[in-house]
Amino acid sequence: MRVPYSWLREVVAAGAPDWDVAPAELEQTLIRIGHEVEEVIELGPVDGPLTVGRVTDIEELTGFKKPIRFCHVDVGDDVDREIVCGATNFVAGDLVVVALPGTTLPGGFAIAARKTYGRNSDGMICSAAELGLGADHSGILVLPPGTAEPGADGAAVLGLDDVIFHLAITPDRGYCMSLRGLAREIACAYDLEFVDPADVKPLPVDGQAWPLTVQPDTGVRRFALRPVTGIDPAAVSPWWLQRRLLLSGIRATSPAVDVTNYVMLELGHPMHAHDRNRISGGLGVRFARPGETVVTLDDIERKLEPVDVLIVDDAATAAIGGVMGAASTEVRADSTDVLLEAAVWDPAAVSRTQRRLHLPSEAARRYERGVDPAISVAALDRCAALLAGIAGGKVSEALTDWRGEPACDGWSPPAIQMPADLPDRLAGVIYPPGTAAKRLAQIGAAVTADGGTLTVVPPSWRPDLLQPADLVEEVLRLEGLEVIGSVLPSAPAGRGLSAAQRRRRAIGRSLAQSGYVEILPTPFLPAGVFDVWGLPDDDPRRGTTQVLNPLEADRPHLATTLLPALLEALVRNVSRGLVDVSLYALAQVVQPTAETRAVQFIPVDRRPTDAEIAVLDASLPRQPQHVAAVLTGLREQRGPWGPGRRAEAADAFEAVRVIARAAGVDVRLRAAQQLPWHPGRCAEVLVGDTPVGYAGQLHPAVVERAGLPRGTCALELDLDAIPLVATLPAPRISPFPAVFQDVSLVVAADVPAQAVADAVCEGAGDLLEDLQLFDVFTGPQLGEHRKSLTFALRFRAPDRTLTEDDATAARDAAVRRAAEAVGAELRT
């Protein structure tokens, strides 16, 4: 939020006329009471002759690729200045700001007389951006008639001695997105009297301004309307108002629109102006209907959803509530009668709609943070009086003031009871008696003391004050957090990492050492990802948990698998030229269960009971820890040693074994079919008899639909399904020599090599130290649908030197066990 210091000082000075602090001091004060000051911008500096001029004559130059104008400008001298200008948003008679030769504009831009486009240009007509007043380069700055006379000091007229505070307002402090809120904060910080600019004299009320109906459950808390008729369509906003809007980052357009923006900045209440003569029948507030569309003020037709809240008349949509007006009731250049609207919308509804439609606005930002419903009519009256004063016309005494629930006294949140010394006890600081009551009264709360207890009714603009802790925070920040001692809490002796944490770190290190790069995956699923994978409707991964207020409207579902985020990252990397990619992620997924219940509300002013904690646990979906990896491109790089090798399913299987070794468990792989993997190159991973995940090459159809490189491989394991091994056994080292033997076994072609290896290991017993498959052979001499697997066996005893007969006996036992388990025959 951009705030001109001169305007802020004026609002504060209404209650403290002598208040005047330097901008640098005010910056530190705002930071001290909890506000984030992103930047303090000093306007200018402009050195040299900057003056107000009046355009007396314009000659359009032709023969150039863009419009060029040769202007005569009266700058108060005896002779008009000749200036070449490329802007077209002004006419003869307009007041402009002229930088004469010798002027240096912000950014070090020096102005000199020069010949350009075949004419002599004796200065420059300036835009707001060139003067450092904003970012608008669309045309030169045209001053309203009567602002100044030609030859007047341009720097003084523009107020270039001002300072702009750029603040980052946190979501819980929406009241500070206004001069009213910030001035109150400053008054609290300096113990000044505060005069509320929202305390305006009410305008007369006689009858209803406009028929209005509001559909239930739309979340509207208040809706006020007042007409202003007979305004002059040729009127323009005065310079003082345009300047304040410009310095606040808003471009002036017309008086009706300008005054709504001005009151929004001043009081924090967004407003909207409708052309009264373009409204057909009564107004209504309702949800959008399926398939309904609206053309907004930017002339774009937008598709609406049934959750969008609209303002409608009998013929068309008049506005998207809290987001943007519709073209049907837009105030235009010939409008003479306007209907001013001040409404309070549901913050969640506004946030959801503006995100989905990509329509962020100053009004929507304020509605998202909460708007004070108590000042709707005051803001409406302030706006109407300003408009009538600027553009003429008559403010109607008719007023529509619809109030929803709750409409309690003052529109305030519920009262809160708090021990008067609670801030002292929580901060460890002894504050003077009455400090809590004083500070809470300063922020606008109604405070009643009864012994040692304060009953506090928060003000209507502070919906964030809900419990004693919130009140304590207000007292502490206004008293200054710097007075709280910096004492480190005494921590209990550390117990180190848990077994699960140690395992997680070991897995991450092992994958990194194997060439994988870790990513931090987003917890939300991309829209339609499971349709791209071709998952059936009853696949458990489709059973997702939906977030009510997602960061992105098109990603409201929490991830049940890590692969979508990894594959998105892989596509992004490949699109940027990184074709050999190996990524992994370690994170939780969210898997709803049939037993998941609604979350029970538990107060935060006490520790939950064991029963309440059990209910909370039961209401949560499963959140197991998963590890997943994806890889594509070359797994072994090309070089003098060879052409390199592309990643394949075997690399995904090896990554599974890397994870298993880090976790201290043995895994088995068996052929399986599971989307999005290729049915012939997918393995189910088992620990004991428990399935823990899948690995292999992705299905070609999925690869094509998802825009992935050909041959992309992936794996995903559920770490929570893998038992924890508290202490990994140390490797057994034998000082005795090993005996090496090979064995070739013939099995059916559809028997997995892993099944044969498992049988060999089981049959060979403890003497078998290592087994490696090093050859697979098929041929007519083996018979149809048969294959030969050759293993290298390494035998070693821990307590003696093995003989060849010992190793042969163990090998023969392994062959017998393989024959029993998978029908293997010894190849001779």
Swiss-Prot record:
<comment type="similarity">
    <text>Belongs to the phenylalanyl-tRNA synthetase beta subunit family. Type 1 subfamily.</text>
</comment>
<feature type="binding site">
    <location>
        <position position="470"/>
    </location>
    <ligand>
        <name>Mg(2+)</name>
    </ligand>
</feature>
<dbReference type="InterPro" id="IPR002547">
    <property type="entry name" value="tRNA-bd_dom"/>
</dbReference>
<dbReference type="GO" id="GO:0000287">
    <property type="term" value="F:magnesium ion binding"/>
</dbReference>
<keyword id="KW-0648">Protein biosynthesis</keyword>
<keyword id="KW-0547">Nucleotide-binding</keyword>
<dbReference type="InterPro" id="IPR036690">
    <property type="entry name" value="Fdx_antiC-bd_sf"/>
</dbReference>
<feature type="binding site">
    <location>
        <position position="473"/>
    </location>
    <ligand>
        <name>Mg(2+)</name>
    </ligand>
</feature>
<dbReference type="InterPro" id="IPR005146">
    <property type="entry name" value="B3/B4_tRNA-bd"/>
</dbReference>
<dbReference type="InterPro" id="IPR045060">
    <property type="entry name" value="Phe-tRNA-ligase_IIc_bsu"/>
</dbReference>
<keyword id="KW-0030">Aminoacyl-tRNA synthetase</keyword>
<dbReference type="GO" id="GO:0000049">
    <property type="term" value="F:tRNA binding"/>
</dbReference>
<keyword id="KW-0436">Ligase</keyword>
<dbReference type="Pfam" id="PF03483">
    <property type="entry name" value="B3_4"/>
</dbReference>
<feature type="domain" description="FDX-ACB">
    <location>
        <begin position="734"/>
        <end position="827"/>
    </location>
</feature>
<feature type="binding site">
    <location>
        <position position="464"/>
    </location>
    <ligand>
        <name>Mg(2+)</name>
    </ligand>
</feature>
<dbReference type="Pfam" id="PF01588">
    <property type="entry name" value="tRNA_bind"/>
</dbReference>
<dbReference type="InterPro" id="IPR009061">
    <property type="entry name" value="DNA-bd_dom_put_sf"/>
</dbReference>
<dbReference type="Pfam" id="PF17759">
    <property type="entry name" value="tRNA_synthFbeta"/>
</dbReference>
<dbReference type="InterPro" id="IPR004532">
    <property type="entry name" value="Phe-tRNA-ligase_IIc_bsu_bact"/>
</dbReference>
<feature type="domain" description="tRNA-binding">
    <location>
        <begin position="44"/>
        <end position="155"/>
    </location>
</feature>
<dbReference type="GO" id="GO:0004826">
    <property type="term" value="F:phenylalanine-tRNA ligase activity"/>
</dbReference>
<keyword id="KW-0820">tRNA-binding</keyword>
<keyword id="KW-0460">Magnesium</keyword>
<protein>
    <recommendedName>
        <fullName>Phenylalanine--tRNA ligase beta subunit</fullName>
        <ecNumber>6.1.1.20</ecNumber>
    </recommendedName>
</protein>
<dbReference type="InterPro" id="IPR012340">
    <property type="entry name" value="NA-bd_OB-fold"/>
</dbReference>
<dbReference type="InterPro" id="IPR020825">
    <property type="entry name" value="Phe-tRNA_synthase-like_B3/B4"/>
</dbReference>
<dbReference type="InterPro" id="IPR005121">
    <property type="entry name" value="Fdx_antiC-bd"/>
</dbReference>
<feature type="domain" description="B5">
    <location>
        <begin position="411"/>
        <end position="486"/>
    </location>
</feature>
<dbReference type="GO" id="GO:0005524">
    <property type="term" value="F:ATP binding"/>
</dbReference>
<keyword id="KW-0694">RNA-binding</keyword>
<feature type="binding site">
    <location>
        <position position="474"/>
    </location>
    <ligand>
        <name>Mg(2+)</name>
    </ligand>
</feature>
<dbReference type="Pfam" id="PF03147">
    <property type="entry name" value="FDX-ACB"/>
</dbReference>
<dbReference type="GO" id="GO:0009328">
    <property type="term" value="C:phenylalanine-tRNA ligase complex"/>
</dbReference>
<keyword id="KW-0479">Metal-binding</keyword>
<dbReference type="InterPro" id="IPR033714">
    <property type="entry name" value="tRNA_bind_bactPheRS"/>
</dbReference>
<keyword id="KW-0963">Cytoplasm</keyword>
<dbReference type="GO" id="GO:0006432">
    <property type="term" value="P:phenylalanyl-tRNA aminoacylation"/>
</dbReference>
<keyword id="KW-0067">ATP-binding</keyword>
<dbReference type="InterPro" id="IPR005147">
    <property type="entry name" value="tRNA_synthase_B5-dom"/>
</dbReference>
<comment type="subunit">
    <text>Tetramer of two alpha and two beta subunits.</text>
</comment>
<dbReference type="Pfam" id="PF03484">
    <property type="entry name" value="B5"/>
</dbReference>
